[in-house]
Amino acid sequence: MRAVQLQSAPRKQINFFPSLTACIRLLVLASLILSPQLGVSAQPERPVTLAVLDFGNTAIGRLASEKVMANLKQETDLMILDRDQSRAAARGAGYAGSLNLSLNEARNLGAVLGCDFLILGDAQTIRRSPSTGPAYFDSYASMFLVSARSGRLVGWERPNFNAPTAVASETALLAALSNEEVRHRYAGSIQRAVENEQGERRLIIDQQTPVIEAAPDDDKSAEAEGLRLPRPYRRLAPAYPETAARAEAEAMVDVLVDLDMNGEVTRVEVARWAGFGLDQATVATVRQLHFFPAMRNGVAIPIRVLLRYNFHKPAK
């Protein structure tokens, strides 16, 4: 291997003691460059705000929401909004306790409350008399975590406890809502939702998503525009999941569906959520559908349609 000799350049005299004026200029320049950066780094991040509304008008509903609120207040990254103010704002907006909201309804409610996320719920104690065995009391709390920014249902759960007396079942429920695991689960869900929404916003900015025409509300309006609406080859009904059966849930699920020029489903978004596994059942069913494509003046076009599914608890 050939050795390469590096030749050093002639040495130059360097003055390590610049003038006082030059030092002052350097210090001023450095302060101007660093001060905005220091201001940004020193500025604390705004905590995520959360509103917890009453879980119905019953005594156990108010107690359950109080327990959840007190539990989540221990999370330093969350700022829990005043309960009385949130209640008054929700009532002023006409919210009556529905757990079956559209994205717009949920966003509007969140805007009225002035929060990033909100927890809606319904808690009750019901006396049940089975055909076999003694009667018992069932205490449950259906809780929905909703993003105020997107209006989406982030997650739901329905803890329930059975006991021979109402006091015993309610005590077990309230103890569960005060559990550390519940607190960490909600904090984790909120953090993931924040990160996902930030990622979606960056994706929207980076990508140029093609605009898809929304279908008119009815065939008459479509015909006036020279448009033939898409039709499914065959209609499929979503299954009524066991999670919904246990809650005896009845609700409506709306989904926005993007169809390409071949009538194939390219995207499904829940526009009205219901929880209890009904949203997932609906999306899974819609993804199996195939359509005769939408036509405008005899030419196939991509289109966005709204599909609605009504769920009823099965007859016993």
Regions found by a protein language model. Give the residues of each.
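Solvent-exposed, acidic/flexible segments
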Residues: 57-65, 99-103, 112, 134-139, ...
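Short hydrophobic alpha-helix segments
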Residues: 84, 156-159, 269, 304
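Short, solvent-exposed, polar/charged sequence segments at loop or secondary-structure edges
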Residues: 66, 80-130, 136-137
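C-terminal/domain-edge helix-coil "capping" segments
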Residues: 42-51, 60-66, 71, 109-112, ...
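Extracytoplasmic
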Residues: 45-50, 63, 67, 75, ...
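Bacterial N-terminal signal peptides
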Residues: 23-36
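Charge-biased low-complexity segments
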Residues: 49, 167, 184-316
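N-terminal secretory signal peptides that target proteins for export/translocation
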Residues: 1-22
